[in-house]
Amino acid sequence: MITLRRAEDRGQFDFGWLDTRHTFSFGDYVDPEHMGFRGLRVINEDRVKPAKGFGTHGHRDMEILTWVLSGALEHRDSLGTHGVIRPGEAQVMSAGTGIRHSEFNASGTEPVHFLQIWILPERQGLAPRYDQVTFADADLRNRLRLIASPDGAAGSVKLFQDARISAARLDPGREVPLAFAAGRAGYVQVAAGSVALGGTTLHAGDGARIEGESELALAAVSPSEVLVFDLA
């Protein structure tokens, strides 16, 4: 079964410096029908204006992954980490027992557009940590590239949860197979462009839950970027 989550149905807020869209309930946006999906708790699509951002704030007991679509995002945290995240880079932060961080647009002239994903950890009280990995365009082009996994397989960032996240940049007419083991579920988030899934076209910002489907194909209708979640 494929259940669509159209972009226009998400929670939407424009704070001037930040335009944000919430796939699942987050902050002031509460929808009992969309509280998360298995271990996947948050998919926020954020656009932040030049030189603006999120001041220092705290998190606990959450796996937080950031995937930048355009621009550059500057990160600082209480572990002493300072990094800039750009397209093709996966950043993960395990909040664990507590971490404080800030995120600002690294550019004074261009906006930054990114997805921030929260995944419930397998257990609480983990030691906070940070990791960041760069993936070449060739590794993402017309294939699903594992970017996050519970064991850090294939050079992906490690998640403390039985969840695997893959990314792909697809040229028009190219497709990638989707396969989920028995008892697992999938979620597709279209970051850019348009793709066909199970006879339905999904556009940028759209998402789809996949349950009880062992094999599907994801085909690009236009130049596209997608994230695919494989969830326990």
Residue ranges, per PLM feature:
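Jelly-roll (double-stranded beta-helix
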Residues: 1-232
